[in-house]
Amino acid sequence: MQFMSSWAADDNRTLLHFSKSTLETFRQHVQASDSDCEAGGLLLGSVHGTHMLIEHATVPTAWDKRFRYLFERMPFGHEAIALARWTASQGTIRHLGEWHTHPEDNPNPSGLDRSEWNRLSAKRRDKRPTLAVIVGRNALYIELVPGSGQGSVFSPVE
């Protein structure tokens, strides 16, 4: 499968670009077989006006809860990486959002996904929307979720 690196919001006002290493992390955790559990982590990168460069995706840790149809990220490990990147970059690299896998070709968010995204977005200190990515077997689902109201869904840019 080939995941695209550049994406645009449905209104074309926001662009995203995923680094090669971020896309490789997604590829390594696709739920290709019936026994594969969901995986996920944080999305770290930089903000450029309304646009974002996603430079790193943390990988599941031993503390995370992973099941076929559920991933629960525990703070241990992920937050330490985010803080280290933020400190080393003097605040340039920040926590932009979260990613996780679904065992389906073309993923869509569940009700649980939506409620979790809304909760995470509402508690952000910087008041920016949360970037939410679901990695399917053949495609990505990408949405920028504000603290309240409707989010922006992204499509690949050729």
UniProtKB/Swiss-Prot annotation:
UniProt-listed SUPFAM superfamilies: JAB1/MPN domain
Full protein name: CD-NTase/cGAS isopeptidase
Protein's GO biological process: defense response to virus; proteolysis
Signals that turn on the gene: Part of a CBASS operon consisting of capV-cdnA-cap2-cap3.
Result of knocking out the encoding gene: Deletion of the capV-cdnA-cap2-cap3 operon (plus neighboring gene Q024_03603) results in about 10(4) higher titer of phage PaMx41 in this strain.
Keyword Membrane assigned: no
Active site: 38 (proton donor/acceptor)
Keywords of the record: Antiviral defense, Hydrolase, Metal-binding, Metalloprotease, Protease, Zinc
Higher taxonomy: Bacteria, Pseudomonadati, Pseudomonadota, Gammaproteobacteria, Pseudomonadales
Pfam name, any one: Prok-JAB
Superkingdom field: Bacteria
Gene3D superfamilies documented for this protein: Cytidine Deaminase, domain 2 (3.40.140.10)
Biological role: Metalloprotease priming reversal component of a CBASS antivirus system. CBASS (cyclic oligonucleotide-based antiphage signaling system) provides immunity against bacteriophages. The CD-NTase protein synthesizes cyclic nucleotides in response to infection; these serve as specific second messenger signals. The signals activate a diverse range of effectors, leading to bacterial cell death and thus abortive phage infection. A type II-A(GA) CBASS system.
Entry EC no(s): 3.4.-.-
Result of altering residue 38 to A: No change in defense against phage PaMx41. Increased conjugation of cGAS to cellular proteins
InterPro entries reported for this sequence: JAB_dom_prok
Chain residues that bind Zn(2+): 100, 102, 113
Organism per entry: Pseudomonas aeruginosa (strain BWHPSA011 / Pa011)
GO MF assignments: metal ion binding; metallopeptidase activity
Family from the record: Belongs to the peptidase M67B family. Cap3 isopeptidase subfamily.
